[in-house]
Regions:
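Iron-sulfur cluster-binding electron-transfer modules in prokaryotic oxidoreductases
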Residues: 1-308
């Protein structure tokens, strides 16, 4: 193994609320694959909700910024390494809040006044990154390939990015820091590096409905139905996504959609990190966390390793 392939990069890891419940399989598989691809994840101490949902309920912009500021102040206390998260909503909200604090002197002052109540302060010097971008720019597909011991040969994967993961880059970097917004390729590249076959998927950045599923479920069902129809038409064995809410919505609403529209969808929806964990030969449950998926993929389960 070359010196480059042994290189390890350290990050402050922000798991986010979904990692404690609906997206435990994302968190567990990310932690499992990180050392395999040279990433050291130091969990953020005493982290709180990013505010993607509750932070917008009332009180204006400050409560939301203060939630972001508190996390980043704690991260600053752990060192100057970049902050990384695997959750699209956490990333979008924390990235946006961080940029606001960095560029708006008045906002930064108000945030630090709020943080002072907890003896905290944030300088605005940290960078917030999404795990997918880190894998693209710090790891690369060649390193992923070098760790594959159990190639996912014959597994057809529809890469569903969702609408949030690449959005801040599209807004602030003139089209994307690591990929384009309209036609991102990174999930396809990840799947191919693992030995799987990416399939054409024209709705890869369509919205799944997000939290609208709570307020207006009928609208969400139509959005998800389109995603499932495209995946089925492409012959996908599984749908791969980086987003906890996308994974939950597209997986959990299939039964409801089948009953409402007379369809027969039963398409497994997994996180890209679960595919990597299987390809790296990690334990199917302790590494890939396949036991946490509601819809099982017989094909992927058959490829996964079970270790004592």
């Amino acid at each position: 193994m070359s010196a480059e392939s042994k290189k390890t990069t350290k990050f402050t890891y922000y798991p986010g609320c979904s990692s404690q419940g609906s997206a435990r399989h994302l968190d567990e598989s990310l932690r499992a694959i990180a050392p395999e691809i040279g990433l050291e994840l130091e969990e953020l101490d005493d982290w709180n909700c990013c505010g993607a949902s509750v932070g917008h309920i009332g009180g204006g912009q400050l409560p939301n910024l203060a939630l972001t500021g508190r996390n980043l102040a704690n991260a600053q206390g752990q060192g100057k390494q970049d902050v990384v998260t695997g959750c699209a909503a956490c990333y979008l909200n924390t990235h946006a809040g961080n940029e606001k604090i960095k560029t708006d002197v008045n906002a930064k002052q108000k945030v630090n006044e709020a943080l002072a109540a907890g003896d905290l302060a944030y300088d605005g010097d940290l960078k917030v990154r999404h795990m997918c971008e880190v894998i693209v720019n710090e790891v690369g597909v060649e390193r992923i390939k070098s760790r594959v011991t159990n190639p996912l040969t014959g597994l057809k994967v529809a890469g569903y990015v969702g609408c949030q993961t690449v959005r801040p880059f599209a807004e602030t970097q003139g089209g994307g820091e690591y990929d384009t917004y309209n036609d991102p390729k990174f999930l396809d590249d990840f799947s191919a590096a693992c030995g799987a076959t990416p399939v054409p998927f024209n709705v890869k950045t369509n919205c799944c409905g997000g939290s609208v599923s709570v307020m207006s479920p009928d609208k969400t069902l139509h959005l998800i139905k389109t995603i499932l129809e495209e995946a089925k038409a492409a012959g996908a064995d599984v749908i791969s996504t980086p987003c906890p809410l996308c994974q939950t919505n597209v997986e959990m609403y299939q039964d409801t959609i089948n009953k409402k529209f007379g369809t027969d969808f039963q398409i497994p929806v997994v996180f890209y990190s679960q595919l990597m964990a299987v390809a790296f030969g990690l334990d199917k449950d302790k590494g890939a966390a396949l036991n946490r998926n509601t819809i099982e993929s017989d094909k992927l389960e058959g490829m996964a390793k079970k270790r004592a």
